[in-house]
Swiss-Prot record:
SS bonds (residue pairs): none
Keyword Ribonucleoprotein: yes
Domain of life: Archaea
Keywords annotated in UniProt: Ribonucleoprotein, Ribosomal protein
Underlying gene: rpl39e
Name of the protein in its database record: Large ribosomal subunit protein eL39
GO biological process: translation
Pfam family, one: Ribosomal_L39
Gene Ontology, cellular component aspect: ribonucleoprotein complex; ribosome
Cited InterPro entries: Ribosomal_eL39, Ribosomal_eL39_CS, Ribosomal_eL39_dom_sf
Family to which this protein belongs: Belongs to the eukaryotic ribosomal protein eL39 family.
Sections of the chain in a coiled coil: none
MF term (GO), any: structural constituent of ribosome
Amino acid sequence: MSKNKPLGRKLRLARALKSNSPVPAWVIIKTNGKFRYNFHRRDWRRNDLKV
């Protein structure tokens, strides 16, 4: 991908980067293990971003 990106694409990539994290340990404890996985996790090789 090019170094110079439009602002909209840059913001969408930043949002995708932030949402690609696991569920924090304190959330798992607080919800008694109800939310154990982040089902929106994405691997950079396997899944393609529509940006």
